[in-house]
Structures are given as C-alpha cells and as structure tokens.
C-alpha cells in the first residue's frame, strides 16, 4: 500500500529516542521530510543523522522543550522554514517515570505538574502553533502518543495525564475536523524501547536469569505473548499520519498486543 506520504512535512517531538525515534524513521522511510525535536542536542543530532543515512531523506534536528511556549514557537517556526510547512505533527514528548505507582502521600505535586506541562500542555502548545499552517493547507494529521495507563489504574500521575490527553484530543478533533485535519490518540502498551531494554538487562544480571526471561515476564503479558516494540507503534502512527486514514478522527488506537479479559468500547 502506498501511504501517499512522499512530499509531506512532519514534526515529531520526543524524536531522539524510543517510540518517537521509530516514528520519525518510518515517516522518513515512507518519503516524508521530518523534523525531530527533543531537549538533548547530542542524541537528537545523532538520531537525525542515523535516520537520514538509512532513508536518504532529510531529517532536521531541532532542540526544543515542549514545556516552554517560546521554545515550541521557535521549533515550529524553524520547521516551517526548513520543511516549507507542516502537514503532520506527532506529539511524543513526555517525562520519564509516570509508570511509577507512588502511594498517595508520596505523590509530588511539582512532579505531577511537570508531567502535565510537558505531555498535555506541551502537546497543546505544539498543536496551537501548527494548526494555522494546516488550516491554510486544508489538510493535516495530528497524532498524540498517550499510553494504556489511561485505561488502567495504578499510577495517579500516568493515568491522569494520559486521560487528559485523550479528552483534549477529542475536543480538538471536533474543532479542526472541518478544516481537513484529523487528530487521534495512540495508546502504546509497555513497549520494549532502548531504555527498557537496558533495565531488563540489569534485572537479568541481578537475578542471574536469561534476558529473554525478564523481557517475556515484563513485556509479554498481552494476548500475543510477545513484547511490543517501538516499531510496532510506529507502523500504526505512520498509517494514521497518511491520507489513507481519513475515516479515523478523534479516536483512540491501542497498540499493546491486546490486554487479556478487557473490553473497551
């Protein structure tokens, strides 16, 4: 299937590592020109060079912090200058650590506020700055990366920020839909990224068991019985970013391998 992404311009926040990196790679592989944004310059530039070398597509690294209005404004401005516009926005930036289930007395309000600022308000800032460009073109795709803890209790911070992102997405989808702009949410499950792979290696060494054992125990608790990887998420996001996904708007897509005994409707 030709996803018709050649010639499209995309911004991927949180694009230097993990799921964001995989998404940027797939978009470039399908022919999109991509700008990736993150706070760490070294990893960002290395990722941009790697993706560009592997896809023969231009990848622009932009140091940016979605928690800051001025940084987001400058990021979008530079991306538009370099790419000639913005057709696709993937909001993948997030603070690490929201999966930790702190007891109620130990929840740090400042940490909570920081996570909301980066992920939820950060996504809002990015959307506010790219939407006018998409409206002028009469076409756009915005994909917000949330997470399965929007559907499951266990982390107050993680659940709250992801539910907020879902609610915001639906409201914005209703507003931007008449302009030809689709806005969706993707819920990755526990995904075996570089960071989690390193953690699994440390756990395996500590327990004296094979790495595969730890990975299957921690990441294979889905119906498929295998870990979800960043590329699994990237395939779905890349489709949602394409003209082929016109019928999907304001909706949530889970990429978690299927949670046992759960029914979502």
For every predicted segment, state its role.
Residues 177, 182, 248-250:
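Short, small/polar-rich loop/turn modules that mediate ligand/substrate recognition or access, typified
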